[in-house]
C-alpha cells in the first residue's frame, strides 16, 4: 500500500547502487520494508530516491539486509541464476505479489517468534480496543497490515511513509500479544514450540529444553523479548541478534504461563540438578 513489495531489477551499476544505499541509510533497523505491486498508493522510499538520482536507475533498492534476499530474477538473468536467488530468499514463495503484509512480516529474518494473526481477528474492532492511543498513524498502519489501499497515500512524504511502516510493525506486535492468548493463537504458537522456533534453554542441566517467548512488561518500549524456560523457570536473552531487538510487549508477560496451563502435558519436571562448585575436587562451603 505505502511501499512496493516484490520484484526489482538487478543491474550491475555498482556505483549508482552504492549511492542509493547511502541515501537510504537510517538509524532504525526495523521501521521500513519494500513491498510490491498491489497497487498501493505511495511510492517506496527507494523508488523516490532513485528518481531523484535520474534516469540512470530504474530499479528499486531494498534498504534492509534481511529483506534484500527476496529479490526476484532479472529478465536477463539465466534460469540457473534465478533458481539460486530463490533458494537464498528469506521469504518463501515465488510470487511476491501474492504475499500479504502479515506473511511478509512474519517471514522476515528475526521475526520467527511471531505467528500469523488471522485477518478476521484484526478486523474486529473489539480486539483492537485501546491501541489507537498507543500507535501513531493508527488508521494508515491498520490499512497497511490488512493490505487495504489508501486514497491518501500519495499525499505522504518519504519520512511519513517510514513512520507508517514503523507504526504498522508496532500495531501488529501489540495485536499479536493479544492474539496469542486466544485458542487459535495458542495453537499457532504450539506448532512453533514443537519446531523449536523459540530456541532452547542455554542452561546445561536443562538439557536443551524448548523455551517460550516472554516480555518483562506489557507496555511497549519497556524491554526486549526474552525466552522463558519452563524447566528451570528462568528467562534468558535470545541467541539471535535480530530477535534480541524485538519489543517484549509484542508477547507480553502472560503468554508462556497461560500456554503451559493450556497444554499441561508439555510442562516438564522442574530442574533439580545444579552446578556444584569445586576447588581441587573439593566442594566449596556455602556460608
Curated annotation (Swiss-Prot):
Family membership: Belongs to the casein kinase 2 subunit beta family.
Biased composition (Low complexity): 41-50
GO molecular function: protein kinase regulator activity
Subcellular location: Cytoplasm, Cytosol; Nucleus
Residue ranges of the region described as Disordered: 1-97
Post-translational note: Phosphorylated by alpha subunit.
PROSITE patterns: CK2_BETA
Bias (Acidic residues): 78-97
Keywords for this protein: Cytoplasm, Nucleus, Phosphoprotein
Function: Plays a complex role in regulating the basal catalytic activity of the alpha subunit. The tetrameric holoenzyme CK2, composed of two alpha and two beta subunits, phosphorylates the transcription factor GBFl, resulting in stimulation of its DNA binding activity. CK2 phosphorylates the transcription factor PIF1 after an exposure to light, resulting in a proteasome-dependent degradation of PIF1 and promotion of photomorphogenesis. CK2 phosphorylates translation initiation factors. May participate in the regulation of the initiation of translation. Stimulates the binding of CCA1 to promoters.
PANTHER family in the record: CASEIN KINASE II SUBUNIT BETA
Organism annotation: Arabidopsis thaliana
A GO cellular-component term linked to this record: cytosol
Record's subunit section: Heterotetramer of two catalytic alpha subunits and two regulatory beta subunits. Interacts with CCA1. Interacts with LHY.
Keyword Phosphoprotein attached: yes
Transmembrane regions listed in the UniProt entry: none
The protein's name in its UniProt record: Casein kinase II subunit beta-1
